[in-house]
A protein has these predicted regions:
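Mature-chain termini and adjacent capping regions
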Residues: 1-171
């Protein structure tokens, strides 16, 4: 894990709150809400797939999105083990789809311990895939893998480098 889990109040019901406001007809009158120490949880039954924490953010009920700052996101594989752990400067979380975009010096750890860094990464919840088409470096047992992007199946832990992958061995 990149950061120690915090004891932040959980806003797992943020989507429900936003939906209630929108259904109440008051959504057009509600300005975006600035919140601090926020946590979003995407779960199905007892299984928590994704937890996104941010130091602060702006929740827009009109677009159903949260613009986040100082972000930590943690994904679980289907076996419940950590599959992907990411920190970044900024992020955008879609409250309706649970899609997530990490922006600004994205650093992460894959389930097998490999570390990576990239300028941005996107997570498509419906496909269970985290990906980037930006340059990425992955450190794995003394070697650095470089590519023009990657595709990572979060639920199964399978990684594929894309666009001109190369390996740099350390002497």
């Amino acid at each position: 894990m990149l950061a120690t889990a915090s004891k932040r109040p959980r806003l797992a019901g943020a989507l429900g709150l936003c939906a209630a406001i929108a259904l109440g007809g008051a959504a057009s009158a509600v300005p975006p809400m600035r919140l601090s120490k926020m946590t979003f949880v995407s779960s199905e039954g007892a299984f928590t797939e994704l937890t996104v924490e941010a130091d602060s953010g702006l929740v827009d009920t009109q677009s159903n999105r949260a613009q986040l700052e100082s972000v930590h996101a943690l994904w679980a594989a289907t076996d419940g083990q950590n599959s992907l752990d990411v920190v970044c400067e900024r992020g955008e979380f879609d409250l309706a789809t649970n899609n997530f975009v990490a922006l600004g010096r994205v650093r992460g750890v894959l389930g097998d311990g490999r570390r990576f860094e990239s300028p941005w990464m996107r997570y498509d919840h419906s496909k269970g895939v985290a990906y980037t088409d930006a340059p990425v470096e992955i450190v794995d047992q003394g070697r650095t893998l470089r590519g023009g992007g990657f595709r990572y199946a979060v639920r199964t832990g399978k990684l594929r480098l894309t666009a001109g992958a190369s390996v740099v061995e350390k002497p």
